[in-house]
C-alpha cells in the first residue's frame, strides 16, 4: 500500500483527494483542465430521477472568505447519467473510482435513483445528499431529523449492493446525533460537511445577491467548522469519514486527518483554481515529510486507533 493510499468501506483509492460533488460535474469539463486519472476518485454531481433546470441566475457569488451557491441541483437526470456520463468516464478513465451522488425529494426518489446509480460498474460508492428538502414534510431537509436519516439510510442500503455514505448537513444544532442516525441505518461511511446556509445582500439594489435568496456557503470560512464537526463525530463512531469544507492546501488535508477523516473532498478551491485537487495531491508527500507522517494509513491508525 502506497503512502497516500486509503481504503473506504472496502474500496481502495490511490490517494485521498477528490473533487466534491458539483465541482467537477460529470468529469468532462474538468478533464480539459487536469488529468482525472491523477485523482483519488471522482464524485459526480448530485443526480435526481428527472432532469432539473436548477435555480434562476445568479446562482453563485463570492463572499469575503468563500462562495455562496444556490445551483438548485441542476442535473440531466439519472437515465442520462447512466446512458452518457458514466459510460464516458468508464471509457476514458476505467481505473478511476466514481462516487455517485444521489439526491431526491422523497424516500421513493432517493431509493429509485440510488438503485439505478449502483447498477453502474464504475460507481464504487454512493454518496447520499440529505440536504435536500423533504416535500412530504413541509420542505424540512432530510438531514436535519435523526429518525428520518435512519429510515432513509435503511431504505437505500436495502436497495443497493454498493457502500452507502451519507453526506451530512451542518445546518443542525448538533451533528453527532445525525451521524449516529446514519450509522444506525446501516451507512458504510459519512461525508461531512455540506455547505452552511448563508446570504448576502446587495447594498445598491437592496436585494439578495443570489436570485434564490439564500445559498450554501463554502470555502475557507467553513474549514474550522468542518474540522470541529469531524472531530466531534469521530469521538462517537468508527465509520470512515470523507472530510469536506475549505480544503485548499495539503496542510488542510492533514488537519482533517488529525480531526478523524479518512479521505477529503475539494470544492470551493477549484472555482478559481481548476487544478487545486492535483496540486494538493502533488504537495502531500512533502507536507507529510515536514510533519513526520510516514503514510496516511499510519496517521489514521495513530488518530483513530
From Swiss-Prot:
One Pfam family here: DHO_dh
Entry's Gene Ontology cellular component terms: cytoplasm
Reaction(s) catalysed (UniProt annotation): (S)-dihydroorotate + fumarate = orotate + succinate
EC number: 1.3.98.1
Class of this enzyme: oxidoreductase
Pathway participation: Pyrimidine metabolism; UMP biosynthesis via de novo pathway
Organism superkingdom: Bacteria
Residues bound to substrate: 45, 69-73, 129, 194-195
Claim: Lipid metabolism is one of the keywords in the record: no
Gene Ontology MF terms in the entry: dihydroorotate dehydrogenase (fumarate) activity
Note describing how the cofactor binds: Binds 1 FMN per subunit.
Cofactor(s) named in the record: FMN
Endpoints of the signal sequence: none
UniProt xrefs under InterPro entries: Aldolase_TIM, DHO_dehydrogenase, DHOD_1B, Dihydroorotate_DH_1, Dihydroorotate_DH_1_2, Dihydroorotate_DH_cat, Dihydroorotate_DH_CS, Dihydroorotate_DH_I
Locations listed in the record: Cytoplasm
Chain sites annotated for binding FMN: 21, 45-46, 129, 167, 193, 219, 245-246
GO biological process entries: 'de novo' pyrimidine nucleobase biosynthetic process; 'de novo' UMP biosynthetic process
Active site per database record: 132
Keywords on record: Cytoplasm, Flavoprotein, FMN, Oxidoreductase, Pyrimidine biosynthesis
Quaternary structure and partners: Homodimer.
Record-linked HAMAP family: DHO_dh_type1
Described purpose of this protein according to its UniProt entry: Catalyzes the conversion of dihydroorotate to orotate with fumarate as the electron acceptor.
Recorded family membership: Belongs to the dihydroorotate dehydrogenase family. Type 1 subfamily.
Protein name per its UniProtKB record: Dihydroorotate dehydrogenase A (fumarate)
Organism: Lactiplantibacillus plantarum (strain ATCC BAA-793 / NCIMB 8826 / WCFS1) (Lactobacillus plantarum)
Gene it is expressed from: pyrD
Amino acid at each position: 500500500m502506497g503512502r497516500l493510499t486509503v481504503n473506504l468501506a472496502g474500496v481502495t483509492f490511490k490517494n485521498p483527494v477528490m473533487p466534491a460533488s458539483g465541482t467537477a460535474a460529470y468529469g468532462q469539463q474538468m478533464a480539459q483542465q487536469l488529468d482525472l486519472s491523477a485523482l483519488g476518485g471522482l464524485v459526480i454531481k448530485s443526480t435526481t430521477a428527472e432532469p432539473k433546470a436548477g435555480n434562476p441566475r445568479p446562482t453563485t457569488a463570492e463572499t469575503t472568505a468563500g462562495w455562496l451557491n444556490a445551483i438548485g441541483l441542476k442535473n440531466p437526470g439519472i437515465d442520462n447519467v447512466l446512458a452518457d456520463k458514466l459510460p464516458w468516464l468508464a471509457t476514458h478513465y476505467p481505473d478511476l473510482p466514481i462516487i455517485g451522488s444521489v439526491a431526491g425529494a422523497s424516500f421513493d426518489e432517493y431509493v429509485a435513483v440510488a438503485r439505478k446509480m449502483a447498477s453502474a460498474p464504475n460507481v464504487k460508492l454512493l454518496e447520499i445528499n440529505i440536504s435536500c428538502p423533504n416535500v412530504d414534510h413541509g420542505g424540512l431537509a432530510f438531514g436535519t431529523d435523526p429518525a428520518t436519516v435512519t429510515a432513509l439510510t435503511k431504505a437505500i442500503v436495502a436497495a443497493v449492493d454498493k457502500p452507502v455514505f451519507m453526506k451530512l448537513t451542518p445546518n443542525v444544532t448538533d451533528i453527532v446525533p445525525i451521524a449516529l442516525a446514519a450509522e444506525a441505518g446501516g451507512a458504510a461511511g459519512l461525508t461531512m460537511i455540506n455547505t452552511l446556509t448563508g446570504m448576502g445582500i446587495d447594498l445598491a439594489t437592496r436585494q439578495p445577491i443570489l436570485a434564490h435568496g439564500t445559498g450554501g456557503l463554502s470555502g475557507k470560512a467553513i474549514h474550522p467548522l468542518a474540522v470541529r464537526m469531524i472531530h466531534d463525530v469521530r469521538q462517537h463512531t468508527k465509520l470512515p469519514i470523507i472530510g469536506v469544507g475549505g480544503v485548499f492546501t495539503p496542510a488542510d488535508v492533514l488537519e482533517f486527518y488529525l480531526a478523524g477523516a479518512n479521505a477529503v473532498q475539494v470544492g470551493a478551491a477549484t472555482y478559481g483554481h481548476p487544478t487545486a485537487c492535483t496540486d494538493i495531491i502533488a504537495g502531500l508527500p512533502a507536507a507529510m515529510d515536514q510533519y513526520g507522517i510516514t503514510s496516511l494509513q499510519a496517521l489514521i491508525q495513530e488518530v483513530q486507533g
